[in-house]
Amino acid sequence: MLFSGFGSKKPFWDLDENGKRVKKGGYTFVVNRDIPNEKKTVDRLHDAKKVELRLKNTMREELKKGRGGKFKKHMKHFIETQHRFFEMPLKNAGFYGLNKPKNVHKTNKPPIGKDKNLRPSYRVVMLTIRNSNGTVESCTKFLKLLIHELSHTLANHVTWREDDHGKDFKECESFMWKILRKK
């Protein structure tokens, strides 16, 4: 495992979660402190929450209809998983997005993917919202990033692997787009 500098035992991918907490629509989001376009940033994180809820509702409907094929376990897992949305920290080790499983533990739930019975208590999803100029990214670019990061949840990726975007991930990401396009 790679570690950050200065003698820290903290892995390089374990990014800072100490931003400014802002509430909107009954949810709390975390943004960088003293940022331009804070309202737009919070709106974008709120949009992420709405997309997550839409995905979960569509998955529930698909499961009620007996659909889902090989993704039934994945969908149940995704529905049960709580996501907290954060703006990507300015010092981000080169990441554009990051899905951080928190409090990972072994369960008796059906195995899913490479991490089998491991599950997080919740996930922190960090998303780049503004480009280096401080301008909010386009909706299209943001949605692609969001679906990409949420696909790690669907695939049940809970342990760090370098470039964890293999066949299982690609299938999950494709399935997420299919679910999003329903309705």
Model-predicted segments: where are they?
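Active-site-proximal or metal-binding-adjacent scaffold patches in catalytic folds
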Residues: M1-K144, T153-K183
